[in-house]
A protein has these predicted regions:
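Electrostatic, structured charged patches in enzyme active sites and in nucleic-acid/phosphate-binding
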Residues: 1-114
């Protein structure tokens, strides 16, 4: 019996052997590896994490957990830092998390792919 993750997504592996939360994300990882091999992007990172810090203080949930954002991919394209998130279902906290990320990390371009 297949086990589904959140939102009925099936975990999948890309050709590079990374485990992803969905088939769509694994397909996008394969595409990005091809772009990197062709020299169109560089410094591809899988699942980078960004922690939200304001005025030198880490944002935390009431239970003490740090608040942050884990994207699917990060890479450099035409000299610009890009962090990319493959979205199937837009979850309810995404608009707020996106706004905080854009405000705290202005040197990154946040790209959403479907």
């Amino acid at each position: 019996m297949k086990r589904f993750g959140k939102y009925r997504a099936v975990k999948a592996q890309c050709h590079a052997g990374h485990t992803h939360d969905s088939k769509r994300e694994a397909i996008r990882c394969n595409e990005l590896h091809i772009l990197q091999a062709a020299g169109e992007i560089t410094d591809l990172t899988i699942h980078p994490q960004y922690w939200f810090v304001i005025n030198g203080r880490q944002l935390k949930h009431p239970n003490g957990r740090r608040v942050g954002y884990k994207s699917d991919f990060e890479y450099v394209e035409n000299g610009m830092l890009v962090t990319e998130d493959v979205k199937g279902v837009v979850v309810r906290d995404w608009p707020l998390r996106r706004a905080v990320f854009v405000a705290l990390f202005p040197n990154y371009h946040l790209r959403e792919t479907k």
